[in-house]
Regions:
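Conserved nucleotide-sugar donor-interacting segment of glycosyltransferase catalytic cores
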Residues: 105-120
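Short, glycine-/small-residue-rich phosphate/pyrophosphate-handling segment
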Residues: 116-160
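N-terminal beta1-alpha1-beta2 submodule of the flavodoxin-like/Rossmannoid cofactor-binding fold
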Residues: 1-90, 95-103, 110
Length: 180
């Protein structure tokens, strides 16, 4: 079995989401399992007008930025396709996802790779028979409240890719001081 662990917190040391994801990985991983690890802060290309336009031009006319974006996108898609279990750790930043996690989803959303258009025009996710664990943390936002835009967005993205089995592990409102 292959487990794909994705960390998105900008904080390398002292990150609660990273620590909880590591504990979860240690709990579910069997000795024979292979782990694919990706820290989204190590290398991420943000989709811009320049990179988005690269999707519409002939590969021979692409710039180095286009080529770098497609190389990373191909790698992210391959990692998703090869995995059986996906663990995504993410803190809530300003009520939503870290920018690197949004960039990851933009680069992983590829027609014919992670989703397709059916003849009726509706979309269908192509990454079936996978399970995802979302390790979501927050300082003040209560998860699954009207202020939490990360959890429903990430569930939607995974479902869009065809991943329907999603379990949330959460530690929210960790910075609130209830003694005051």
């Amino acid at each position: 079995m292959k487990i794909y662990q994705i960390d998105s917190s900008a904080r390398k040391d002292g990150s609660t989401s990273r620590a909880l994801a590591k504990k979860l990985l240690d709990k579910i991983k069997k000795p024979e399992d292979e782990v694919i690890y990706r820290d989204l802060n190590d290398e991420m290309v943000f989709v811009s007008n320049l990179t988005e336009s690269g999707m519409k031009i002939d590969p021979k006319d692409q710039t180095e930025t286009h080529k770098k974006m497609f190389k990373l996108s191909d790698t992210l898609v391959k990692e998703l396709k090869e995995s059986d279990i996906i663990i995504i750790s993410a803190p809530i930043y300003n009520y939503g996802p870290p920018a690197t996690l949004k960039a990851w989803s933009d680069l992983a959303a590829r027609v014919g790779e992670t989703f397709r258009f059916k003849p009726n025009g509706r979309r269908e996710g192509l990454l079936k028979n996978k399970k995802a664990y979302l390790v979501i943390t927050s300082g003040g936002t209560k998860l699954n409240s009207n202020e939490d835009f990360l959890t429903p967005w990430l569930k939607f993205i995974l479902n869009f890719f065809g991943i329907e089995k999603v379990e949330v592990v959460s530690a929210d409102q960790m910075s609130l001081d209830y003694e005051k």
